[in-house]
Design a protein with these regions (language model features):
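Short, flexible beta-strand-to-coil junctions
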Residues: 2-8, 45, 152-154, 159-160
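N-terminal ordered "arm"
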Residues: 1-35
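Charged/polar, solvent-exposed surface patches and flexible loops
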Residues: 27, 31, 65-68, 80, ...
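Structured domain cores in non-transmembrane regions
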Residues: 23-88
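Intrinsically disordered or highly flexible coil/loop and linker segments, enriched in small
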Residues: 7, 73-76, 148
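Extracytoplasmic/secretory-pathway segments with low complexity and glycosylation-like composition
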Residues: 78-79, 83-119, 137, 159
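Acidic, proline/glycine-rich low-complexity IDRs
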Residues: 112-160
Length: 160
């Protein structure tokens, strides 16, 4: 961040880690957090696309809070998830209804995992499940009737 100096005033720059302590911010830069007399000149953030030169300290802290509330799987695949969600806030709002299948590489893996977690099928042996259950058909059904995002590190089941 740096201050916006008027003619003849010195420009002060300082690097802050998030979340930004407002009192420290005001002390280091000598301007109020609500003043708008500062601008963001550099940033290293996962959600950098959400931050602009005139983003306020309060907005930065709010974005940081939302990002930290995402699961580690969602943070790792944040860029991929933004292909489906409009922005960080939209992802944050839906974070508790997104189901993550971190060890799944295909929809067949998701079908297997869903079956293993279903109480009606839990008592069946794996051999029995393999023999009687068509995982490929179930995977196709899931894909046709659900919304999934396949990433390098797993599969996300998204709300409709």
């Amino acid at each position: 961040m740096e201050t916006r100096g008027t003619t003849g005033e010195e420009t002060i720059s300082y690097w802050f880690d998030l979340p930004i302590d407002v009192a420290e911010f005001e002390e280091k830069l000598g301007v109020g957090a609500e003043s708008g007399d500062y601008r963001i000149i550099e940033k290293v953030l996962a959600f950098a696309n959400e931050v602009h030169e005139h983003t306020s300290v309060y907005q930065l802290n709010e974005l940081d809070f939302m990002y930290r509330q995402l699961s580690s799987d969602m943070q790792e695949e944040y860029v991929s998830l933004l292909t489906v969600f409009e922005n960080l806030e939209a992802l944050y709002i839906c974070r508790n209804v997104i189901i993550v299948y971190p060890d799944c590489k295909s929809m067949i893996d998701v079908a297997r995992q869903k079956l293993m977690n279903d109480p009606m099928f839990k008592h069946l042996s794996e051999d029995c499940q393999e023999y009687y259950f068509d995982f490929e058909a179930y995977a196709s059904h899931l894909q046709e009737h659900g919304k999934f995002l396949v990433t390098e590190h797993g599969i996300f089941e998204l709300p409709e």
